[in-house]
């Protein structure tokens, strides 16, 4: 797993605001800078993962994780070859899957529940696919990647 280790349980977004702003500015001037995409996606993930925002129904966390996903996918599309990016992408998809696990049937109608289930299954499938790819790329840690795969199903 890739994470920010600054000695705290979870990183404080205020502490990294300058870095985030700098990365955002860099991405506005050069939208093909894969290193900036990687680090910005890492910050989005770190500030919106299970430890930082434990409520699965947190809409802001979901939106930020989608931004992280877009950055990671774009960096992969621009041929950034780094196993850390592949690990980060798998983690992002796993977190996105988690965001759809809460039983909020009271909040959504049947069409919205079907849409959420479809998104959950899509993210789950991609996360597991990326963990399988990582197991092939990094065979010495294959068992660990297999343990990270998502085994639960949509709750409704």
Per-range role (PLM):
Residues 16-32:
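Post-signal-peptide N-terminal segment of Sec-exported extracytoplasmic proteins
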Residues 73-77, 85-92:
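A generic tandem-repeat structural signature
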Residues 2-20, 43-74, 94-145, 149-156:
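Short coil/linker segments at helix-helix boundaries
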Residues 1-5, 38, 87:
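Alpha-helical tetratricopeptide repeat
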Residues 34-36, 85, 143-145:
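TPR alpha-solenoid repeat register
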Residues 34, 40, 89, 133-134:
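Secondary-structure boundary/capping motif
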Residues 28-31, 78-81, 136-140:
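Short coil turns that delineate tetratricopeptide repeat
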């Amino acid at each position: 797993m890739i994470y920010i280790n600054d000695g705290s349980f979870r990183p404080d977004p205020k502490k990294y605001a300058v870095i985030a702003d700098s990365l955002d500015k860099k991405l506005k001037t050069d939208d093909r800078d894969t290193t900036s995409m990687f680090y910005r996606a890492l910050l989005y993930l770190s500030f919106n993962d299970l430890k930082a925002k434990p409520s699965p129904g947190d809409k802001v966390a979901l939106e930020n994780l989608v931004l992280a996903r877009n950055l990671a996918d774009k960096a992969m599309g621009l041929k950034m070859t780094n196993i850390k990016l592949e690990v980060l992408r798998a983690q992002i998809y796993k977190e996105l899957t988690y965001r759809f696990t809460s039983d909020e049937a009271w909040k959504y109608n049947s069409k919205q529940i079907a849409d959420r289930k479809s998104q959950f299954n899509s993210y789950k499938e991609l996360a597991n696919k990326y963990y399988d790819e990582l197991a092939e790329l990094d065979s010495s840690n294959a068992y660990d990647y297999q343990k990270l795969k998502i085994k639960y199903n949509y709750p409704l």
